[in-house]
C-alpha cells in the first residue's frame, strides 16, 4: 500500500510539521501543535487529532487525559506543503490545557512602548478539576 500522500508533506529537519487546529462552524483557531508522520497517519486512521508532543517525546492523542478529544472533519495542506490545517469538532468545548476554549486567550493591547498582553477569554473549567487523578497530571 502506497502512502505517497505522506511524502507530499514537507517535514522539517526533526520530521515534524506545524499544525493549526480550527473549529468547524465557528472557525475559531483553537490551538497550534506539531505532527510527525505517524501522528498524521493515526489522525487519518482514527478521525481524531493525534499530535507529536515535543516535551514528552511521544505521540499525544488530544484529549487522552482531559477527555477533550478533537473529531477531525477535514485535513488541509498549505500552498508550500509545510503547514497542516485540521478542521475539528472540539469535544467538551475546551481545547486548551488551561481550561479555556482556545489556546489563544491573550491579546496584545497598546503600543510598542507600553503595550501588554491581556487575558480576554475566560477559564471554562479549572484545569485541576480536568486533570484530577490523572497519572503524572501532565496538562496537554
UniProtKB/Swiss-Prot annotation:
<comment type="similarity">
    <text>Belongs to the PRA-CH family.</text>
</comment>
<comment type="pathway">
    <text>Amino-acid biosynthesis; L-histidine biosynthesis; L-histidine from 5-phospho-alpha-D-ribose 1-diphosphate: step 3/9.</text>
</comment>
<dbReference type="InterPro" id="IPR038019">
    <property type="entry name" value="PRib_AMP_CycHydrolase_sf"/>
</dbReference>
<dbReference type="GO" id="GO:0000287">
    <property type="term" value="F:magnesium ion binding"/>
</dbReference>
<feature type="binding site">
    <location>
        <position position="103"/>
    </location>
    <ligand>
        <name>Zn(2+)</name>
    </ligand>
</feature>
<keyword id="KW-0460">Magnesium</keyword>
<keyword id="KW-0368">Histidine biosynthesis</keyword>
<protein>
    <recommendedName>
        <fullName>Phosphoribosyl-AMP cyclohydrolase</fullName>
        <ecNumber>3.5.4.19</ecNumber>
    </recommendedName>
</protein>
<dbReference type="GO" id="GO:0004635">
    <property type="term" value="F:phosphoribosyl-AMP cyclohydrolase activity"/>
</dbReference>
<dbReference type="Pfam" id="PF01502">
    <property type="entry name" value="PRA-CH"/>
</dbReference>
<comment type="function">
    <text>Catalyzes the hydrolysis of the adenine ring of phosphoribosyl-AMP.</text>
</comment>
<feature type="binding site">
    <location>
        <position position="79"/>
    </location>
    <ligand>
        <name>Zn(2+)</name>
    </ligand>
</feature>
<keyword id="KW-0862">Zinc</keyword>
<dbReference type="GO" id="GO:0000105">
    <property type="term" value="P:L-histidine biosynthetic process"/>
</dbReference>
<keyword id="KW-0479">Metal-binding</keyword>
<keyword id="KW-0378">Hydrolase</keyword>
<feature type="binding site">
    <location>
        <position position="78"/>
    </location>
    <ligand>
        <name>Mg(2+)</name>
    </ligand>
</feature>
<dbReference type="InterPro" id="IPR002496">
    <property type="entry name" value="PRib_AMP_CycHydrolase_dom"/>
</dbReference>
<keyword id="KW-0028">Amino-acid biosynthesis</keyword>
<keyword id="KW-0963">Cytoplasm</keyword>
<feature type="binding site">
    <location>
        <position position="96"/>
    </location>
    <ligand>
        <name>Zn(2+)</name>
    </ligand>
</feature>
<feature type="binding site">
    <location>
        <position position="80"/>
    </location>
    <ligand>
        <name>Mg(2+)</name>
    </ligand>
</feature>
<comment type="subunit">
    <text>Homodimer.</text>
</comment>
<feature type="binding site">
    <location>
        <position position="82"/>
    </location>
    <ligand>
        <name>Mg(2+)</name>
    </ligand>
</feature>
<dbReference type="GO" id="GO:0008270">
    <property type="term" value="F:zinc ion binding"/>
</dbReference>
<dbReference type="GO" id="GO:0005737">
    <property type="term" value="C:cytoplasm"/>
</dbReference>
<dbReference type="InterPro" id="IPR026660">
    <property type="entry name" value="PRA-CH"/>
</dbReference>
Amino acid at each position: 500500500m502506497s502512502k505517497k500522500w505522506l511524502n507530499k508533506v514537507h517535514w522539517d529537519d526533526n520530521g515534524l510539521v506545524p499544525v493549526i487546529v480550527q473549529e468547524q462552524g465557528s472557525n475559531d483557531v483553537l490551538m497550534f501543535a506539531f505532527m510527525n508522520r505517524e501522528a498524521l497517519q493515526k489522525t487519518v486512521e482514527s478521525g481524531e487529532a493525534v499530535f507529536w508532543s515535543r516535551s514528552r517525546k511521544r505521540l499525544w492523542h488530544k484529549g487522552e487525559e482531559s477527555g477533550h478529544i478533537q473529531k477531525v472533519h477535514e485535513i488541509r495542506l498549505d500552498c508550500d506543503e509545510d503547514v497542516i490545517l485540521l478542521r475539528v469538532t472540539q469535544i467538551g468545548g475546551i481545547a486548551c490545557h488551561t481550561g479555556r476554549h482556545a489556546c489563544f486567550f491573550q491579546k496584545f493591547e497598546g503600543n510598542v512602548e507600553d503595550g501588554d498582553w491581556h487575558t480576554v477569554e475566560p477559564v471554562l473549567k479549572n484545569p485541576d478539576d480536568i486533570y484530577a487523578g490523572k497519572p503524572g497530571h501532565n496538562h496537554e
